[in-house]
A protein has these predicted regions:
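Substrate-binding/gating loop at the entrance of the active-site cleft, primarily
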Residues: 106-123
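Well-ordered alpha-helical segments embedded in enzymatic catalytic cores
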Residues: 65-69, 89-93, 113, 142-149
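N-terminal "arm"/small-domain region of PLP-dependent enzymes with the aminotransferase-like
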Residues: 1-61
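Short beta->alpha connector loops at strand-helix junctions that form conserved
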Residues: 107-108, 127-132
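Conserved beta-loop-alpha segment that forms the PLP phosphate-binding cup at the N-terminus of a helix
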Residues: 78-101, 117
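Conserved N-terminal alpha-helix of the aminotransferase class I/II PLP-enzyme fold
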Residues: 42-88, 109
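Active-site phosphate-binding strand-loop segment of PLP-dependent enzymes
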Residues: 136-164
Length: 164
């Protein structure tokens, strides 16, 4: 069975054409810097919304196909690739589910962008404590029982953020 990789294949086809970089990002495929060879190779694939590569802000071709494959893989209705990393995803998720005064359950050791989004939207956080993992000497997941208890105490909750 051949796996489908529409975005990867489009990037490979683009790079094989050895195009001149007259667009952002400014590293120009790694050519104008003294970076290690392997990193320069990776930068060949760091391209923006160019012909044949689709557009993350409005996918209609290879990115749309890749997002559909990802959704299918995880049994989700839809899947979205993010621009600007996890921060934009956390902001979008909280803005889409909460408004001022809404209750949101949040893992106490979540990414700082989660707390930023909660503050920006004006939601009211209910903090969920993660278990301490003695093996790794770090915070682990929030126990299921903790989540159930929080939902009982605050049935008005609009969203829950568990990031680890």
């Amino acid at each position: 069975m051949k796996s489908e990789r529409p975005l990867v294949e489009a990037l490979q086809t683009f790079v094989e054409k050895e195009p001149y970089s007259l667009h952002v990002p400014g590293h120009k495929n790694g050519l104008i810097s003294a970076l290690p060879k392997q990193l320069k190779k990776a930068l060949l694939y760091d391209v923006t919304e160019l012909t044949g590569l689709d557009d993350f802000h409005h996918p209609e071709d290879v990115i749309e196909k890749a997002q559909k494959l990802l959704a299918e893989t995880y049994g989700a209705n839809r899947s979205f690739f993010l621009v600007n990393g996890s921060t934009v995803g956390n902001l979008a998720m909280i803005y889409a589910t909460c408004k001022k005064g809404d209750t949101i359950f949040v893992q106490r050791n979540a990414h700082k962008s989660v707390f930023h989004a909660i503050q920006l939207v004006g939601a009211r956080p209910v903090y969920l404590a993660p278990q301490w993992d003695e093996h790794t000497n770090s915070a682990g997941a929030v126990p299921f029982e903790t989540v159930k208890e929080a939902l009982k105490r605050h049935p008005e909750g609009k969203a829950i953020v568990l990031t680890y």
